[in-house]
């Protein structure tokens, strides 16, 4: 998650993300709020797909948020997705070392959503990303906003 650049080279940003699905699988949406605490500049983006899963939309929200960064950043990522958090902090290194396979008992099987995990891994290379879990639907302002935007994004597919 960290490259050889010094800590001072990383601009601090906050990335809030959420994914939502109507049915799982079903129509889904993703959203992010990206904020620079130094300037208070903020961007919000969202999108959707007609047939997807909640986990795919959670991953897409983080990927699209990281893609929006134009320079190396120290990213504080806030998400209610334990799937994203565990994948980034615990599972991804092992998956990569096994050729993007996961252990299932004594055998190796393909990682679910592997294309998205690989895209996330690629996006993370330029940044220092720190995951922070927030409880969903618990009044966290930015998480609630992302949820609202993600739900609105999939409405067009209903």
Swiss-Prot record:
It catalyses: Endonucleolytic cleavage to 5'-phosphomonoester. Its EC number is 3.1.26.4. Binds 1 Mg(2+) ion per subunit. May bind a second metal ion at a regulatory site, or after substrate binding. Its cofactor is Mg(2+). InterPro entries: RNase_H, RNaseH-like_sf, RNaseH_domain, RNaseH_sf, RNaseHI. Monomer. Endonuclease that specifically degrades the RNA of RNA-DNA hybrids. PANTHER family: RIBONUCLEASE H1 (PTHR10642:SF26). This is Ribonuclease H. It comes from Rhodopirellula baltica (strain DSM 10527 / NCIMB 13988 / SH1).
């Amino acid at each position: 998650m960290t490259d050889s650049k010094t800590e001072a080279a990383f601009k601090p940003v906050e990335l809030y993300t959420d994914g939502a699905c109507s049915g799982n699988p079903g129509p889904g949406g993703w959203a992010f709020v990206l904020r620079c605490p130094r300037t208070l500049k903020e961007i919000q983006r969202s999108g959707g797909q007609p047939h997807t899963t909640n986990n795919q939309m959670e991953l897409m929200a983080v990927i699209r948020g990281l893609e929006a960064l134009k320079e190396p950043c120290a990213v504080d990522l806030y998400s209610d997705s334990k799937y994203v958090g565990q994948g980034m902090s615990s599972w991804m290194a092992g998956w990569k070392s096994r050729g993007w396979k996961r252990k299932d008992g004594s055998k190796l099987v393909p990682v679910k959503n592997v294309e998205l995990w690989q895209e996330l891994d690629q996006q993370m290379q330029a940044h220092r990303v720190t995951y922070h879990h927030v409880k969903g639907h618990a009044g966290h302002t930015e998480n609630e906003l992302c949820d609202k935007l993600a739900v609105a994004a999939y409405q067009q597919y209903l």
